[in-house]
Amino acid sequence: MNLIDYEKQYDVIVAGAGHAGCEAALAAARMGCETLLLTINLDAIALMSCNPAIGGLAKGHLVKEIDALGGEMGKNIDATGIQYRILNTRKGPAVRASRAQADKQLYRLRMKHVMEEQEHLSLKQGEVTGLVVEDGRVRGVVTKVGVRFLGKTVILTTGTFMRGLIHVGLTNYPGGRAGDLPSVGLSDQLRDLGFTVGRLKTGTPARLDGNTIDFSRLEPQYGDDPPVPFSFSTERIDRPQLPCYIAYTNERTHEIIRSGLDRSPLYSGVIEGVGPRYCPSIEDKVMRFPDKDRHQSFLEPEGRDTVEYYPSGLSTSLPIDIQYRLYRSIEGLENVEIMRPAYAIEYDYVDPIQLHTSLETKLIRNLYHAGQINGTSGYEEAAGQGLMAGINAALRVQGEEPLVLGRDEAYIGVMIDDLVTLGTREPYRMFTSRAEYRLLLREDNADLRLRERGHAVGLVRDEEYRLFLEKRERIGAELERLRTAKLLPSEADPSFLETYGMTDLRNALTFEQLLRRPDITYEELSQIDPVAGMVPPSVKEQVEIQIKYQGYIERQLDQVARARKLEGTRIPDDLDYTVIPGLSAEVREKLLRFLPDTLGQASRIQGVTPAAVGILSVAIKSRSASS
């Protein structure tokens, strides 16, 4: 094919406009880089291919972090959501999480508008079929119609599109998702360049016609009132919310599913890719948990101006006749019509251990990977990676050091470290349990952790940063006030003392000491402290958490300080593991495969013992001394 060179050269080229691609392109453009976003379909920018929702357990943490760094996802869901809830409100602050139902089409359209109006960002429709690589560096991309776009850096955010194959029963056909063509050729070139390309699988349920659902027989689930925004920049959300509905499968449903397993691509061996462990299909759940007589599903509206409903928990790749029978066996859905069939999709991904923590590939300089190409699942995981890839591609263009978030700084840092240190053989999703310092990585303090970083790279606007500094200052001032303000026994309200078991109080207590008690919150404190009632809610929340959990927080900070010694020791790129005495053959093999960037990463590789880490540390110090 004769290639046509496009007239303009770019700083950053992003291939793919899903949730990773959008954040990557916006970050690079907002940092002043001339950025090109290429996508197979401009009408599918930020399309929610699966559930119409943002956030959830640990995923809400990622969205808050994206927002704190200056990303767009939090603002977008605040502007287009139709129901908002805080999960785990009865548990500790470390595991509380925000979740919102989205108006699927409004979400897509608003994100597209934001990108169209973004300075330094160009959007073009085109399928990237190859990379331009010279002397171990990426120089640009080639599209299906023969246009070569040249750029200093390239970010691949291919989603489920690389050699995507859709399955409905034993019927399968190429597709990146329902209604879109797959990307062909790119994964073959990546394999030729030395990348390890694997195969994964995911799936989605049918979309149901709400006009054919009997909602009177289902249990409604309402959002929180008032709704709590995702973005630290959103003051409030005033739009009315829509309910979801809870339904359950039954034994008849399970019998129907079992009767169709001979035509299931999952159980007949047609699907080769590994599916998501934590988001199994309904046939998988029925077979893995035969003792369960029912499984829950939330019927989620896809928007205000559509009748389509998404039945979460009921994804399947069974044939369409079985799909009709299984959905209609559920109470309230006896007459339901399927508007879009459920399906499974297989796609190629690249082993993420071939990435640096900056998300730049180890094999090709200036090439970055983000999102499902790295083996992750979920919009939020993709967006977090996309944001970091966009930031680091822009920093490379600007000649600056990459921004790498530590495991003690952000869930984004935990996720990327997990991926590049351990790799993945199944779709990776974020959980709070993956973070060893989760009390430090709460949703509520994402701005305190990351706003400085976002402002330093140019993503957090000056006005947003000013408001953040004011909030941080007020938190510090309030903590100091509570340490000095006192409840004196001679002046205390007897009823207050009696209520909280302090009738024998002899010595003065500071308000900080009072607030440390589990039975006293700001609401109770305001009975004896008029100033407490005037403290802004966001400041109250921070102050109360910091006081009540002070001992636990200090303990985790001590753990972080010890771990940073390993994290701060970089392993030279040209360190020859084969000549270091004392390393076992297994350890050498693991180190040569994973090529860790730091001693901290090396310590997390399965099979690399503390003794081996000590030997590595000595080898690095000896090398530094001799040079």
UniProtKB/Swiss-Prot annotation:
Its cofactor is FAD. This is tRNA uridine 5-carboxymethylaminomethyl modification enzyme MnmG. Homodimer. Heterotetramer of two MnmE and two MnmG subunits. It is found in: Cytoplasm. It comes from Geobacter sulfurreducens (strain ATCC 51573 / DSM 12127 / PCA). The gene is mnmG. Keywords: Cytoplasm, FAD, Flavoprotein, NAD, tRNA processing. GO terms for molecular function: flavin adenine dinucleotide binding. Belongs to the MnmG family. FAD binds at residues 16-21, 128, 183, 372. The lineage of its organism: Bacteria, Pseudomonadati, Thermodesulfobacteriota, Desulfuromonadia, Geobacterales. GO terms for biological process: tRNA methylation; tRNA wobble uridine modification. Gene3D superfamilies: FAD/NAD(P)-binding domain, GidA associated domain, C-terminal subdomain, tRNA uridine 5-carboxymethylaminomethyl modification enzyme MnmG/GidA.
